């Protein structure tokens, strides 16, 4: 997660979006504030799992013993893309937007982000999380109404 965090920070710096780091976690929360009443959050997991990647493909993990399984690298890339597009079009927004790059999804580390106040200043009214899945057809999305922040 430490190398992933550094890559996220570098990209956010390149596009010019502000972000907050948290002392007890590798979490990053970027935000676009426009003094709006409502704030929407977008969330993706950034953690690697302690698994050796056995397939010898171009995109294989370069770090032995860890890999971004379950699509975590895709989740991070998608959220970074959302940061870029929404920041470039911030004049069209009618809400503040917070982007949650959450570490330790598999072990419930979202709890530490919440304890450190990531849902405040401005208060977040709703969060949309994302997860890629092989059970979802290409060009489709699946929406569930539930409360989760692992």
Model region roles, listed by residue range:
Residues 29, 49, 57-67, 74, ...:
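Histidine/acidic-residue-rich, glycine-tolerant segments that coordinate divalent metal ions
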Residues 81:
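Active-site signature of alpha/beta-hydrolase-fold catalytic machinery across serine-
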Residues 1-68, 77, 85-93:
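Acidic/His- and Gly-rich active-site-bordering loop/insert found
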């Amino acid at each position: 997660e430490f190398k992933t965090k550094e890559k996220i920070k570098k990209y956010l710096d390149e596009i010019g979006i502000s972000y907050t780091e948290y002392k007890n976690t590798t979490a990053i929360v970027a935000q676009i504030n426009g003094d709006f009443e409502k704030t929407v959050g977008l969330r993706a997991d950034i953690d690697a799992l302690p698994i050796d990647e056995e397939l010898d493909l171009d995109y294989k993990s370069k770090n032995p013993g860890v890999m971004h399984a379950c699509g975590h690298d895709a989740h991070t890339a998608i959220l970074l893309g959302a940061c870029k597009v929404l920041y470039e079009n911030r004049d069209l927004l009618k809400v503040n937007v917070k982007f949650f790059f959450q570490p330790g999804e598999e072990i419930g580390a979202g709890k530490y982000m919440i304890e450190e106040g990531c849902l405040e200043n401005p208060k977040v009214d709703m969060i949309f999380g994302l997860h890629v899945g092989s059970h979802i057809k290409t060009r489709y999305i699946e929406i569930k109404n539930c409360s989760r922040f692992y």
